[in-house]
Amino acid sequence: MKGISKVLSASIVLMKLKGVYSTTVLCGDSTQGLQGTTQPSYVLVPSAPETIANCGYSPQNMYVPSTPTTMPSTVPGTTGESETPTSPTSSPTEDVGTCKIAVVKHCDAPGTSSTPCEPEQTLAPSQPVAATIATPLVVASVQTPQAAVTILTPKAVSAQPATIISPFNQAPGYYNSAIPGQILTGNVLSPSASSCQVVPGTTGSSTPQQLPGAVSSGTIPCQIVQGTQSSGNTPGQQFLPGIVPVGSLQPDQATSGTPTPSVSQSQSGQQCCCTPPITNPVMPTPMGISSNGYPSSTAYAPTLGQLGPCIDTQKSTSSCEPKEKPVAQYGMEACAAPTPTAVLGNAEYLLSPGMYNSLNSPCNACCQQQC
């Protein structure tokens, strides 16, 4: 019953947010390039998983529908105890294919919380709970321990080709060697920033560089990259793969990028990088996020990795819970393999493939700035 009440409360919250998300589609058959230009950065999964067709920058991200399951029917006005499954052998699971829901444990960043991360929670096997769907959006998928979680690997993916997004349709960021959708580790650009920023340290030909943070509005388009030495005490330079170097190269300088005719020339010893010319998406206003529109912990990463089993993100022992706004106080109970999510308070929002993800909860920054 506890799980049902949380799901129902989530449905009410999503009704309030209907104006923001009701017209948003994660992926679709009819519109190509939708992810790159018109989609907001925070996207909830649509209620009809079969509409998710173009979910990929790689075969691992393709949508592969599994065998449909029969959902228990509920008569309006009745309680969970009176629900009658249409099939005694049906399993209350949600078909979300490889565009799956991923849940991140809701706890403060390491070393900043007075309470440790809460242990994983499971549902009692004696109380099967039906998944509740808030049309037109999937709110949650509550499963019993007997409901197996299908983690699709590349071997399980069908032969359907993944949608390749053109470089100029991608989200802003730093991309590796012209591979669509592959993003180097580092922070996002602020909306008013120009396309280059300092990359300290030695740059290897295949080592992703940790960018030092969002650049300020006064950053010039090209800045010097400090790298290895070319001769004596003269600093040498190397170039990130896929970033366009221009101008004359000094001895021992190297590049694996491809110059682009449209890129303006710069002085010797500098580098320029190309950022797709699209507008940075902005956080929906009901979330109460200010500044440049991103959570404090939003960062690019090449992969998310395994994010763990089914847990409840609404923890009563969280040090920030009493200070968070009610509109974000609901939990999503779901089991899945990695799909980028943004953690806003106690809420988890799915992001389209290759967009932004939040690996650590911005709970601390929320409380420090607003409370």
From Swiss-Prot:
The keyword Transport does not apply. Residues 65-94, 255-270 have a biased composition (Low complexity). Keywords: Glycoprotein, Signal, Sporulation. Residues 1-22 form the signal peptide. One of its GO terms (biological process) is sporulation resulting in formation of a cellular spore. Involved with PTP2 and PTP3 in formation of a polar tube through which the infectious agent is passed on to the host cell. Its main location: other. Residues 65-95, 229-270 are annotated as: Disordered. The host antibody response is directed against the post-translational carbohydrate modification. It comes from the Eukaryota. GO terms for cellular component: polar tube. It is found in: Spore polar tube. This is Polar tube protein 1. It comes from Encephalitozoon intestinalis (Microsporidian parasite). Glycosylated.
